[in-house]
Amino acid sequence: MNSFLQSLEDPARPFLGPNYWILKKMGLLLPKSILGKILYIFLHETVTFFVATQYMELYVIRSDLDLVLTNMKISMLSVVCIVKVNTFVLWQKHWREVLDYITEADNFERQNEDPVKSQIVEAYTKYCRRLTYFYWALVSTTFLTTTCSPLMRYLSSSTFRENMRNGTEPFPHIFSSWMPFDKYHSPGCWITVLWHTVLCAYGAAIMAAYDTCIVVTMVFFGGKLDLLRERCKHMFGSYGTVITDKQCEEVVRQLHGIHVMLIKYSRLFNSLLSPVMFFYMVMCSLMLCASAYQLTSAQNAAQKLLMAEYLIFGIAQLFVFCWHSNDVLIKNENMTSGPFESNWYTANYRQKKDVLLLSGQLRIKNIFTAGPFANLTLPTFINILKGAYSYYTLLRK
């Protein structure tokens, strides 16, 4: 396993290595060849069509609440998945700009020999590796529990097995979707199982690629803010050092340039992320509600365990986005104090004016949003959980 993880590292992209690898493998970053692009786009749109068949099935089963909730629990997450894929492919050019900026800015920081800055770079790199691999493991576990859910239901319930034998229970499937043939009897049932398993693996890999890319980008922006604050602390050198007005202007110009680029690309990143997060927030409350309702309605321990894992994944996915976005917001606010943590009081009048100008520039910040109505913060996370609980209580009544 260690050798495989090491093979994911990229010397040209020391920060984004594993994330860039999975983005390319899953076709979110399209290859240069025309044939490769066509094949990946065909794959993505095939899955988009499959999600449409889930909603076709939803119309067929609309009179059965339990079947509707089972369908919605998966189909809403499926919709979010294809929105992520299609927006990433559609806005390919802008995503590449963001990723190239991250690589360039990260390589610039790694060339610095200052021990404090090197420690910050090493800390956020290690954190992103651990977070990426943990999230991949969580997605893999969710994939296994989702695909094995019908099997566990069959093995854990003798009543269900007996009902299947006498024909009162249909063949259980991973997803609730329309098929153009009889999916409840052989060979159609096994073709459907294979089809669903492949699509579930695809969806899990897409989520692993997209979500970790989003989170490590947020972590990078937070790390960049820490580094900018550290630079501001030493803009006048060590205590007792005197710098000329020209040197001060050069330092302020460099800090200003770093901050302008940071704001530019964080806003570009937010413009790519915000529409997807808005759609995700709308779906998330309903998805969590359906999962919680089915968890409390499950008849045996095995089903409850599988439902609980799926619910935990949904909450963890939302929490990771809101937590790291909130962390960037806090670091934005802390970064503005950087110039006043320097030896500004030893500077002359002209240099102090430069400090004031810089501090005004650093007050400009970017907040990651979920559409025009909500910010990606911890209060938003709590409000979504409250909304999901409200829907849940309505269903229970």
PLM features per residue range, with description:
Residues 57-62, 86-93, 262:
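Cytoplasmic, membrane-proximal interface of class
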Residues 74-94, 144-147, 204-220, 224, ...:
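Hydrophobic alpha-helical membrane-embedded segments
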